[in-house]
Design a protein with these regions (language model features):
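Active-site nucleophile and cofactor-binding loops and adjacent substrate-binding regions
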Residues: 110-123, 139-149, 195, 238, ...
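Positively charged, low-complexity intrinsically disordered leader regions
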Residues: 33-35, 41-46, 63-136
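Short glycine/serine/threonine-rich phosphate/pyrophosphate-binding segments
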Residues: 117, 121-127, 141-159, 173-176, ...
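A short, small-residue-rich loop immediately preceding and capping a beta-strand
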Residues: 115, 131-168, 256-270, 286-289, ...
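Active-site/ligand-binding loops adjacent to catalytic centers
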Residues: 203-229, 233, 255, 280-283, ...
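Catalytic phosphate/nucleotide-handling subdomain of diverse soluble enzymes
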Residues: 284-289, 391-431
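Glycine-biased, low-complexity coil/linker segments
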Residues: 16-18
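Active-site-proximal loop->helix
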Residues: 140, 148-206, 297-308, 417-420
Length: 431
């Protein structure tokens, strides 16, 4: 049996719900829309639907997280590690040649330049500090592309903590370098052989492990999914991305907001971080790219916003790819990091409200965009990030439009995929 907190339908969500409208780093109060109600709802999405054995774990975390992450001590420690260990701020880079191609002013938020090669480290640092302050000694995590697994194994090595990573066997095979990195960092990697053997199954397995070790174990969730308070924790840890975009734009163009924000979305953490400080700013259009796989009219897709219906997955009410009788469908995409049959409840809500425009990007479009960015700017993006780059082709801009696109990770882990599918890259694939 799970706990269903009452859905609250007030829009916009009032700050009176006691969910603290402050960003992790202080600064101005953050939009209502980016934070859930006290019971963890964004509109009708979210909440905490967990088995009874996890009830105490989840409640303890709900009670503990805000006082800890809003404390000066935490903020100071978090900021210092982001700066000195992760290498933040990440650059906001004016992509001149891509700007000329698309007739806009394109800036790339370079999360690929963080330590470990993606945005995932921001959240891993924040959550391990939280776990330590809560007295937990063992860390578990799920991973798809392996980036969150690597980031988690990295911070566990940094703090000398036990680390176990659950990863679908399919992903273990297609992301081999990251598996070896995790092992080198001292993590134990469990290949998951249930279901489709990808990210969703890894999450289920991690939750099972958490059920068996509720006292000493902290589940370090990698995306804005799972039971409340995880979507809010991850969004707050990643909000450093949009916090930096604000001052970096101010420095570069004399105003602190773009006309467009573009990011890829699977569970939704880099997207949440990219839009966090802009959700209530109507001057900013938000465009997210989800994984279309072979196409949204096929059974081989991971486009949850396009193809999902309301349901419960991994402890949250959100949009889910499911059969008519509520069985969760397998998600298909070339990108291990977007291979999730659900979506963070914050994004389900914002998409439903029309605040986010969500485009489905197919495998071939993503591969093409990865080659295009590589040949045009000398930046090899992760296949996940290439989905965001592909969104540029589907939009029309004015020359004055300022567009900020988050390159969520680097493409080293995907070289095999890029080479195997180079025929999808048209003129770029001939080498």
């Amino acid at each position: 049996g799970g706990e269903a907190a009452p859905a609250e339908h007030s829009t916009p969500l009032s700050l009176g719900e006691g969910h603290g409208g402050e960003a992790v780093h202080g600064g101005e109060a953050v939009s209502d829309e980016a934070s859930p109600t006290k019971s963890g709802f964004y509109g009708q999405f979210g909440g905490a639907y967990v088995p009874e054995i996890l009830y105490k774990c989840v409640h303890d975390l709900q009670d503990a997280y805000l006082p800890i992450i809003e404390s000066e001590e935490f903020k100071q420690e978090f900021r210092t590690l982001l700066r000195d260990y992760a290498g933040r701020p990440s650059p906001l880079y004016y992509a001149k040649r891509m700007s000329e191609r698309y007739g806009c002013q394109l800036y790339l938020k370079r999360e690929d330049l963080n330590h470990t090669g993606a945005h995932k480290i921001n959240n891993a640092i924040g959550q391990i500090l939280l776990a330590r302050k809560m007295g937990k000694t063992r860390i578990i995590a799920e991973t798809g592309a392996g980036q969150h697994g690597v980031a988690t194994a990295t911070v566990c090595a940094l703090f000398g903590m036990d680390c176990e990573i659950f990863m679908g066997k399919t992903d273990v095979e297609r992301q081999h370098p990251n598996v070896e990195r995790m092992k080198m960092l001292g993590a134990k990697v469990h290949p998951v052989t249930t279901g489709n053997m990808t990210l969703s199954d890894a999450c289920s397995e991690a939750i099972r492990d958490w059920c068996c070790h509720p006292e000493d174990t902290f589940y370090l969730v990698g995306s804005t999914m799972g039971p409340h308070p995880y979507p809010d924790i991850v969004a707050k840890m990643q909000s450093v991305i949009s916090e930096e975009i604000k001052w970096q734009l101010q420095e570069k163009i004399g105003r602190d907001y773009p006309d467009y924000l573009i990011a890829c979305v699977g569970g939704g953490s880099n997207a949440a971080g990219t839009i966090y400080h802009y959700v209530d700013d109507d001057r900013v259009k938000i465009v997210l790219a989800e994984a279309g796989g072979h196409g949204i009219d096929t059974d081989y897709t991971a486009a949850t916003i396009h193809c999902g219906t309301e349901g419960i997955i991994h402890g949250a009410r959100t949009l889910v790819m499911q059969t008519d009788d509520g069985q969760i469908k397998e998600a298909f995409t070339i990108s291990a990091g977007l291979d999730y049959p659900g979506i963070g409840p914050m994004h389900a809500y914002l998409a439903q409200q029309g605040r986010e425009k969500v485009l489905a990007i197919n495998d071939d479009e993503a591969i093409y965009a990865g080659y295009e960015l590589t040949r045009t700017e000398g930046i090899i993006p992760a296949i996940e990030s290439a989905h965001a780059v592909a969104a540029l082709r589907k939009l029309s801009f004015k020359p004055s439009d300022v567009v900020v696109l988050t390159v969520s990770g680097r493409g080293d882990k995907d070289m095999n995929t890029y080479l195997t599918h180079k025929d999808m890259a048209k003129e770029y694939g001939k080498f």
